[in-house]
Structure formats: structure tokens, C-alpha cells
Amino acid sequence: DRNIRFVGGIYDFRKLNSIRHYSYAYFHGHSVGGTNPSLLEAMASGCFILAHDNIFNRAVLGENALYYGSTDAAMEMLDGIDQAVSAYKKEYTGRNLEVIRRDYSWEKLADEHEEYFKWMLAQPRHG
């Protein structure tokens, strides 16, 4: 399909976020690890996300994405992509933006780290 682009590495963050924001859909193929920064960036850019189905992606996205388990399943998703975008884009992207604001703000993360360090300092020292 001429609308599918494999653009390679893009290291200009502003350009990358612009591409994400104006994309029709974003495939997130990471299958291992924890919270992936590129997934959070795609969520913050308002992307409609199609993600590899694994515990890490589901922990971040919840029900706010479409999931595929194999290359064949991903290809099948493309057959119905127009209907999926029409049905779910506004809902999924809106909820993903809420998750980003609520769970991944620098203020929240800094506060959580501060509380953890305070707790650590209050623990009895042994040895």
C-alpha cells in the first residue's frame, strides 16, 4: 500500500513527533522490556496505536489500542484499519492522553522518587 511508510531512524525529536501526530496509525512492535519510551511518545502524540500483544504493552495501553500477536495478525488488522480508526481513534487517543498526563508527568515521577528516597532515608541502617 502506498500509504504505508517505513521511514527508518528519525533523530530529530520535533520531526518525529510531528510524523507521529499526523500519522493515520502507529505500529508498536516492541515485544520485550518494560515501559517503552517510544510507546509513551506515541501516546502523547495522539497516535492511534496498533501494538504487539504482550504484558508490557498492555500494562501501559490497557484497552486503548488494538493488539496483534503475529505478523499475519498485523496484516489482517490492516484490512479493517479504516473501520477501526473511525470507531476507536477519538476514544483511544483521548484516554491515552489522560494516562500520559496522569501517570507519566515529570512532576508525578519526581514526587514518587522523592517519597521513595525519604522512605529509604528513614529506614534503620544495619552494619
Predicted regions and their residues:
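Short acidic active-site motifs
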Residues: 14-15, 73
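Nucleotide-activated donor-binding/catalytic signature segment of Leloir-type glycosyltransferases, i.e.
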Residues: 1-13
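Short glycine/serine-rich donor-binding loops of glycosyltransferases
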Residues: 36-39
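Short alpha-helix at the nucleotide-sugar/activated-sugar donor binding site of glycosyltransferases
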Residues: 42-44, 58
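A charged, aromatic-enriched C-terminal amphipathic alpha-helix characteristic of glycosyltransferases
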Residues: 86-125
